[in-house]
Amino acid sequence: MIDFITFCDYTGTFAFAISGIRLASAKQFDWFGAYVVGVVTAVGGGTIRDILLNAVPFWMEQASYLIVSALALLFVIAFRKYVIRLNNTFFIFDAIGLGLFVVVGIAKTLDFGFPMWVAIVMGTITGSFGGMMRDILINEEPLIFRKDIYALACVFGGLIYYICMQTSMSAAMIQFVSALSVFLARIIAVKYHISVSVLKGEE
């Protein structure tokens, strides 16, 4: 039986890959190009995290992440009528992947013995940098740099993780609550049009 953090890792990979493939399809990429975008979305943030932690990037040790991304492509192809045509498909899968990857990044960083503030930074990188790479590949302004609550949702989830660590909650419950808080922060921010003020320069 897999532990909760492994479940988060693979589920997040699947969700993020779908979000990348969904956007690639909107740009009329072929299936291979869409797969590449999906893989980059799924492993990009974790790769940067591992490099900063002086670790071998996780997907180089386990090809299963590339296989999960391929399954995401097959999922989109099989259910393209629903996945591609529904406008909120990208948002939902992206929010799911964001929340799950934040806790994966935090947990791995803590396992390496780093302090909590570093773990929150790494959780934010794990959650948001794959999406940044995705947006660059498809020639879009990275979502992380827009006024949307995106990276801040990751930081919020990290703070919730830290607060929960001060309680008697199990590790799995802490990770679940943290991931859920990131997901809900994204949903609420979009639903109620909550955003960060834009820094305007002189015209």
Predicted region positions:
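C-terminal ends of transmembrane helices
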Residues: A17-K27, D50, L74-N87, M132-P142, ...
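Structural signature of hydrophobic alpha-helical transmembrane segments
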Residues: I2-T13, P57-L71, P115-G127
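Helix-coil boundary and interhelical linker segments in multi-pass alpha-helical membrane proteins
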Residues: M1-F4, D50-M60, G105-V118, I163-I174
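Cytoplasmic-side transmembrane-helix entry/capping segments in multi-pass membrane proteins
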Residues: F32-V40, Q62-L66, N87-L98, M122, ...
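Intrinsically disordered, low-complexity non-transmembrane regions of multi-pass membrane transporters
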Residues: M1, I194-E203
